[in-house]
Regions:
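Acidic/polar loop patches that form or flank catalytic/metal-binding clefts of enzymes
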Residues: 45-46, 118, 143, 156-159
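Short beta-strand-to-loop capping motifs
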Residues: 39, 134-138, 215-217
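Proline-centric
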Residues: 212-222
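Short amphipathic alpha-helices in soluble, non-transmembrane regions
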Residues: 48, 143-152, 228-231
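Short, conserved charged micro-motifs
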Residues: 139-145, 220-226
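C-terminal alpha-helix
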Residues: 230-238
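Conserved PLP cofactor-binding pocket of PLP-dependent enzymes
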Residues: 56-64, 105-109, 146-211
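Active-site region of PLP-dependent enzymes
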Residues: 2-8, 15-131
Length: 239
């Protein structure tokens, strides 16, 4: 969701030696699946190019005659997915403009409630505005708001990561218990299982009070107003 965002004038994905973007169907721009690695370093480009295609060096037109300087894997994006991506990237500026407009309208509605605080953005001008992350005073209040939003049918698009099975470590029991389909190297297994004993209380305090609202490009002003008012009514009722 960070594609198109910037930090101090530099585009995200271009700040370090390499950057990555996912293009699955929930991202700001999508190919349906797949992603990219971006780099200005020729050595990283060549290694990434081979690593994602079984280790092929791509120096000729005969795949069977390619050399294999290292082991690679099949992480290629298909030509059909790439074609969708090329069409999408032409509209990225349009997507970002809509995202920012809809984000700002909804945030202004939520900001009516003094008990709500918002995620600190290190560079507001560079925010891609794909989500609004907002916070309530306590875990108990937040869970009550989530439950009431669910009861009223307005929870979809609002994510409580703290109770999510995938997006926050609290419920990653498969990782903490090293549940795999193949044997891990003992060193790697030990590092993985360390996660079960780590203290995430500081993160828990933040995440247990956070709800993230996804910003849709399809909303019109009336829909945003209606959505925001319903959310505000639920929050006020719980508070």
């Amino acid at each position: 969701q960070s594609i198109g965002g910037t930090y101090k004038g530099k585009h995200l994905g271009t700040i370090g030696d390499a950057g990555t973007f996912s293009f699955d169907f929930v991202k700001t721009m999508t190919c349906g699946e797949g992603g990219v690695i971006m780099t200005n370093r020729e050595d990283l480009y060549i290694k990434s190019d081979g690593y994602t295609d079984h280790g092929h060096d791509h120096k000729g037109v005969d795949r069977g005659a390619d050399l294999h300087p290292f082991i690679g894997y099949n992480y290629r994006i298909s030509e059909l997915h790439a074609a969708v991506g090329l069409a999408q990237i032409k509209r990225l500026d349009e997507f970002l403009s809509l995202q920012k407009k809809n984000h700002n309208q909804l945030k202004n509605i939520l900001a009516q409630i003094p008990a709500i605080s918002f995620r600190r953005i290190p560079d507001l001008a560079g925010d891609s505005c794909s989500f609004i992350s907002w916070f309530l005073p306590t875990e108990e209040i937040t869970k009550a708001v989530v439950a009431e939003m669910k009861a009223q049918g307005i929870l979809p698009g609002n994510f409580y990561w703290y109770d999510n099975n995938w997006h926050y470590i609290r419920k990653w029991d498969h990782l903490k218990n090293s549940v795999t389909l193949n044997s891990l190297h003992p060193e790697l297994k030990a590092r993985v299982m360390e996660q079960a004993n780590k203290d995430f209380s500081a993160s828990d305090d933040v995440m247990s009070r956070c709800i993230s609202t996804a910003i849709s490009l399809l909303w019109n002003e009336e829909q945003i107003q209606e959505k925001g008012e319903k959310m505000v009514n639920v929050i006020k009722a719980v508070l």
